[in-house]
């Protein structure tokens, strides 16, 4: 007896899943790319975010709300997305001001969201691609060749994203170190991988010591917005070998990496201090 509308902005909802949700509860409105299979399943395609926020009672998306979206939210609207309230107090205030009912996707269950797993795995693969000399990398082979050692990789953060990246890189033969602030997480990963990975507490001094010998860094840390006590400073990046790779999966402005700036799919790489 419950009727509402449901929208996905960036999450990949499969056509069968869309069909099931339509039959049970919802009319699905999707605002990414048009797909006949979604239409066949009963999804409604729209062209603008304004249409979505203006008509949907339940809004689900992947990333945090952008400031341009704050004014589109309506009182009583239910929203479900990654909010990361500790890192985005201004977003929390906007949700309170608009009087919406908000659920933090990242805290909805202990196993995290599939998009976090996808980001970790794809980030690892993008890092390996960037290591190729044709992309400016040092050309080191992930698992090593003959008498040549494999890549040394540092993963910042042992959460869902970091664990997904670790699964890919360990399977391919990389020498991986995971840094996290939770010793319980590190112990669990050590046991899971039968002591075949290195772990350490994530702080600047520990990272500084191993960075010169590290071939690739993956940042999987959600950093408090505005905190400029970077885990990796520009000066630390200078200690890495030219052609080394940093993959910032967290993608936070003023995040854990001082040298971060946004990129596009068309031009995803840039060079800072030779890295």
Give residue ranges: language-model regions.
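Short amphipathic, helix-prone segments within low-complexity/disordered or flexible regions
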Residues: 2, 6-20, 24-28
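Glycine-rich phosphate/diphosphate-binding loop of Rossmann-like nucleotide-binding domains
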Residues: 1, 23, 27-36, 134-219
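Rossmann-fold NAD(P) dinucleotide-binding segment
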Residues: 61-86, 212-213, 226-246
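Rossmann-fold NAD(P)-binding glycine/threonine-rich loop
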Residues: 86-107, 235-275
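An N-terminal-biased, well-structured beta-alpha scaffold segment characteristic
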Residues: 1, 23-94
